[in-house]
Amino acid sequence: MNYKKLSLLILLFSAGLMNVAAQKSPQDMDRFIDVLMKKMTLEEKIGQLNLPVTGEITTGQAKSSDIATKIKKGEVGGLFNLKGVDRIMDVQKQAVENSRLGIPLLFGMDVIHGYETMFPIPLGLSCTWDMTAIEESARIAAVEASADGINWTFSPMVDISRDPRWGRVSEGSGEDPFLGAMIAEAMVMGYQGKNMERNDEIMACVKHFALYGASEAGRD
């Protein structure tokens, strides 16, 4: 399976388009993805990579906002920082009912150290060396976030930072790669479980791209 198929598989699995979750086998899933991708234009495929920040949308605005126009054209794959079941349902309805292919949106948020229940920052959690507790904190965050319509978190952060002046050092697990790797594994398991079959699990997105934590003089 190529990367395009894999990306779309994740999208469809998490969103439940046309009851994909009920597919019986990987072969069925591959066929479903092949058929859908053959229907997509290049613009629609690129649109699946678009993740606008739209936290300002309120209930009732989705139909008239600029983002609604883009959703109808298939130019949006997900929304970032949109919170609230009513608002998410309002926007999702636009995608499913008014876009050409009816592909539902992903809804992502920086669920870094809890969602409604706040836990210590990742740097603080790392000091415990308690992988069971760390995994449980991510599990609780996933349950709460998924109940609010969120299905994608940009966590854990695995940047190794050895300069405390860097403003994002609190989001990571410190300067030890071994500890950071253990914590990342625990958090991913807490967020999405073993196979993401439950509706109270969310996708984890390990970040950031290579060497982002190797800042100079603490500058981001």
Q: What is each PLM-predicted segment?
A:
Residues A21-D220:
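Glycoside hydrolase catalytic-domain context in secreted enzymes
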Residues M1-S25:
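Bacterial Sec-dependent N-terminal signal peptides
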